[in-house]
């Protein structure tokens, strides 16, 4: 083989699950633990070359993922089992590959995505949990999930989410299109399930923080609509904690035919 002859490059997509409680977010950063850094290290070991991954959504410190999607390019030709079982063998126990799929050159985990879906899990009980303490948010006041659901429906469609946007958000626009938002109760768990084309920084956690005030009867049902119209972050409730938030699914055009495993988290039925 001549020096000029290039090896073929393969583009691979992976579905990733992780417990974010011990990580300083998804994105690789100097001197702190990140999910991206651990995944790239494991992939590089299997590929026997440096690997850089691109993700669908960069989750914050303490936030979890059951449906994160990444892609990477490599000259390494490996069987699917190497990219799943082999990579998992090199990952810490709180990160796992769920599926693998070869994708065409035009695929991008972030820019090809048409929607992202999050679930926020509230453990609504008088006493705090121990086993799932880093996987749910504890809220001791009784919550009316049906009231929260009704209040949330004003967020559907395209809206300016300035009132639910972090001050440090770097997005060029506060406008987002919410496709669905449902609030349901499953025993002691209250689940806020929201899907949108994209999210401004802390959008889900800020929405949930205000919905909990409505669910606890500290604010009227109309309050969420009033906040949305006000376009003022200072009027809304405090940001809900990170530990209850999960990135559960990312939508892509059907032509990519990516796997769609159960969304989870695993202790919840779909």
From Swiss-Prot:
The source's superkingdom equals Bacteria
GO MF term set: RNA binding; tRNA pseudouridine(38-40) synthase activity
Q: Where is this region: Interaction with tRNA?
A: 168-172
According to its UniProt record, what is one Pfam family this protein matches? Answer: PseudoU_synth_1
**Catalytic activity, EC:** 5.4.99.12
Q: Which GO terms describe its biological process?
A: tRNA pseudouridine synthesis
Q: Which cysteines are joined by disulfide bonds?
A: none
Provide the alphabetized UniProt keywords: Isomerase, tRNA processing
Q: Which InterPro entries match?
A: PsdUridine_synth_cat_dom_sf, PsdUridine_synth_TruA, PsdUridine_synth_TruA_a/b_dom, PsdUridine_synth_TruA_C, TruA/RsuA/RluB/E/F_N
Q: Which catalytic reaction applies to this protein?
A: uridine(38/39/40) in tRNA = pseudouridine(38/39/40) in tRNA
Q: Where is this region: RNA binding?
A: 107-111
Q: Where is substrate annotated to bind?
A: 118
Site described as Interaction with tRNA, positions? 58, 78, 110, 126, 139
Active site positions: 60
Known role? Formation of pseudouridine at positions 38, 39 and 40 in the anticodon stem and loop of transfer RNAs.
Quaternary form?
Homodimer.
Family, similarity comment: Belongs to the tRNA pseudouridine synthase TruA family.
Q: What is this protein called?
A: tRNA pseudouridine synthase A
UniProt gene name: truA
């Amino acid at each position: 083989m001549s020096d000029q002859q290039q090896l073929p490059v393969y583009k691979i997509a992976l579905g990733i699950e992780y417990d974010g409680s011990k990580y300083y977010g998804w994105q690789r950063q100097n001197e702190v633990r990140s999910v991206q850094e651990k995944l790239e290290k494991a992939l590089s070991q299997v590929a026997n070359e440096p690997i850089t991954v691109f993700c669908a959504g960069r989750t914050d410190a303490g936030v979890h993922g059951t449906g994160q999607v990444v892609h990477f390019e490599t000259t390494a030709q490996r069987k699917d089992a190497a990219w799943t079982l082999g990579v998992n063998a090199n990952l810490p126990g709180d990160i796992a590959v769920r599926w693998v799929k070869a994708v065409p050159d035009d695929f991008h985990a972030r820019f090809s995505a048409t929607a992202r879906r999050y679930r926020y899990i509230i453990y609504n009980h008088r006493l705090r949990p121990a086993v799932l303490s880093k996987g749910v948010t504890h809220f001791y006041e009784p919550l009316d999930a049906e009231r929260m659901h009704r209040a949330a429906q004003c967020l559907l469609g395209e809206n300016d989410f300035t009132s639910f946007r972090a001050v440090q958000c770097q997005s060029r626009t506060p406008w987002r299109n919410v496709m669905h938002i449902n609030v349901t109760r499953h025993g002691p768990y209250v689940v806020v399930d929201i899907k949108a084309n994209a999210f401004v920084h802390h959008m889900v956690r800020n929405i949930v923080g205000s919905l909990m005030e409505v669910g606890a009867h500290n604010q009227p049902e109309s309050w969420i609509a009033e906040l949305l119209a006000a376009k003022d972050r200072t009027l809304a409730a405090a940001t809900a904690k990170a530990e209850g938030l999960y990135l559960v699914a990312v939508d892509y055009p059907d032509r990519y035919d990516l796997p769609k495993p159960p969304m989870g988290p695993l202790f919840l039925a779909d």
